[in-house]
Amino acid sequence: MWYLVLFSLLASFSAEPTMHGEILSPNYPQAYPNDVVKSWDIEVPEGFGIHLYFTHVDIEPSESCAYDSVQIISGGIEEGRLCGQRTSKSPNSPIIEEFQFPYNKLQVVFTSDFSIEEQFTGFAAYYTAIDVNECTDFTDVPCSHFCNNFIGGYFCSCPPEYFLHDDMRNCGVNCSGDVFTALIGEISSPNYPNPYPENSRCEYQIQLQEGFQVVVTMQREDFDVEPADSEGNCPDSLTFAAKNQQFGPYCGDGFPGPLTIRTQSNTLGIVFQTDLMGQKKGWKLRYHGDPISCPKESTANSNWEPDKAKYVFKDVVKITCVDGFEVVEGHVSSTSYYSTCQSDGQWSNSGLKCQPVYCGIPDPIANGKVEEPENSVFGTVIHYTCEEPYYYMEHEEGGEYRCAANGRWVNDQLGIELPRCIPVCGVPTEPFQVQQKIFGGQPAKIENFPWQVFFNHPTAGGALINEYWVLTAAHVVEKNSDPSMYAGITALRLADLENAQRLYTKRVIIHPGWKEDDDLNPRTNFDNDIALVQLKDPVKMGPKFSPICLPGTSSEYNLSPGDMGLISGWGRTEKRLHVINLRGAKVPVTSLETCKQVKEENPTARPEDYVITDNMICAGEKGVDSCKGDSGGAFAFQVPNVKAPKFYVAGLVSWGKKCGAYGVYTKVKNYVDWILKTMQENSGPRKD
């Protein structure tokens, strides 16, 4: 068994200061041992440096001298490390390596590791004391101004205007009291660009005439002041003070502050404070007087005219608010105002601000409502809704309004026009249920036929087609330009009429194709038996008041024999010439030829005298028909392709040869264009 014995030889040698000496590695010139650490502390007299020479180097080589090496250490810092086999760079000199230090102390350390594969002899070196020039050989100059060297020492001196401090190294100077009044000038630290004096406080004053501000400009390279300590405090500093503003303190290599300082003041104080240490060159600045400027952006949400990079004393600007904002002064609002740059650097009218435009409380609409907004300023969104289920909004996207820049509530589709709530047509709250086929129909509720209108004197009917218009037969109103009408009733008793909603006529418009009767003979021509009654006031829709739809013009609205429709009214029944309560019936469509074959009850009229045209519908069956008193009422049919009960007026009760058989109805589909055109031409400004 092999045992590896490791030992370490740690030694340190020092002696009294000498002017020269020799250093040899252990066992030199024999091979040095393993695992050795040995150091030599070299010291020469004060005021001298050390010159170290190596005449032999034979140490185990390794990368970065990591295994065996000789180190040269000065002030705790490694100045060199040698290993390997070195030879002289010059054939006439024994010197292999040399080091020179301006300090009087030096340490040499030799280290070997635990394993040496070959035999190495180590190193040989010697040193000598050399004179040091403290004024030039050291990084830190010992004197703040003049350094005077002699063998073994130095002394400091100052320029004539300076004095030497008690530390015999630093010079001080008195540098306060200067006042600068010119509009342009230059100021620098004492002795610039040479090192400024230590332990000094320099105060300068710049005083310009009113209306000008002091503007200081610096170049970074013109500033070299002792930097801040680890806590951020400046031992030497430059500070500016103007009114209630302070700039600085500043220190460091290169000016750390803004290169241009606009003080907004016509006076500026400058203080330069130094401590007992430092060898920096100081600073130099330039200043000039600039007309007092005012900040460019004094208001938000606005544009300035003229738009300039800089505004100065007495400049006037027009400030215009951006879209959606306005200026309010008392009860007056505007989109712009004027402001003047004042001598103190503040704008006149600085209290005015561009604030969001106020659109006010949204206007109400008829038959609808608007949500109450939290505020009514620019950008606020509100929504209008209609009173369902009796009204719907005319435009699907017409409910949302936004407070616009012009102070109006605006809809993307309608602009500033308010939305309109249109009555829902053709939808009864209680659809009519047919129980049996009887002459004169069966009792009905107004909720079955909410479009039913009663005409008094003579008794007749009409159909409400919107809030302002009633559709009826021409023969009902041809001799009455102001008919008496009621809506929302079923019974015709006097008390019922007094409580019903009276409809007042604005105008009666009879179709131009209707021929006037001569009153001498029974009427036999009912072609174009249709008229419109315009109301003075709109009808408020609800369970008892609701219009019936107009027919479409497509083929889907063509009627065929056998199609069933509803009629309603207060006409003659099998037992009574007229009835008190509203009745309804379901009636089938038949061919026009059927109506031609009905025997006339009036013996004075011949069947061939009656005019039958394509503007008419024939409907009815034995025992189920409209009769006198039902004239002008609606012949209602289910709207095509709609599952829920919804009705349109296909016909108007017009005439018949006798009751209880077949009747003739005005075909409304043929008159839709005339109806719409007439209503449009006679619709004045809405009251809603």
From Swiss-Prot:
Keywords: Calcium, Complement pathway, Disulfide bond, EGF-like domain, Glycoprotein, Hydrolase, Hydroxylation, Immunity, Innate immunity, Metal-binding, Protease, Repeat, Secreted, Serine protease, Signal, Sushi. Residues 16-130, 175-290 form the CUB domain. Specifically expressed in male reproductive tissues. The record marks K437, I438 as: Cleavage. Cleaved and activated by C1R to generate Complement C1s subcomponent heavy and light chains. The iron and 2-oxoglutarate dependent 3-hydroxylation of aspartate and asparagine is (R) stereospecific within EGF domains. Ca(2+) 1 binds at E60, D68, D113. Pfam families: CUB, FXa_inhibition, Sushi, Trypsin. Its EC number is 3.4.21.42. Glycans are attached at N174. Residues 438-680 form the Peptidase S1 domain. The modification (3R)-3-hydroxyasparagine is found at N149. Ca(2+) 3 binds at E226, D236, D275, G278, Q279. It comes from the Eukaryota. Component of the complement C1 complex, a multiprotein complex that initiates the classical pathway of the complement system, a cascade of proteins that leads to phagocytosis and breakdown of pathogens and signaling that strengthens the adaptive immune system. C1S is activated following association of the C1 complex with immunoglobulins (IgG or IgM) complexed with antigens to form antigen-antibody complexes on the surface of pathogens. C1S is cleaved and activated by C1R to generate C1s subcomponent heavy and light chains. It comes from Mus musculus (Mouse). Residues 131-172 form the EGF-like domain. Cleaved and activated by C1R. Immunoglobulin-binding promotes autoactivation of C1R, which results in the cleavage of the Arg-Ile bond in the catalytic domain. Inhibited by C1 inhibitor (SERPING1). This is Complement C1s-1 subcomponent. GO terms for molecular function: calcium ion binding; serine-type endopeptidase activity. It is found in: Secreted; Cell surface. The gene is C1s2. One of its GO terms (cellular component) is extracellular region. The keyword Zinc does not apply. The active site is at H475, D529, S631. Belongs to the peptidase S1 family.
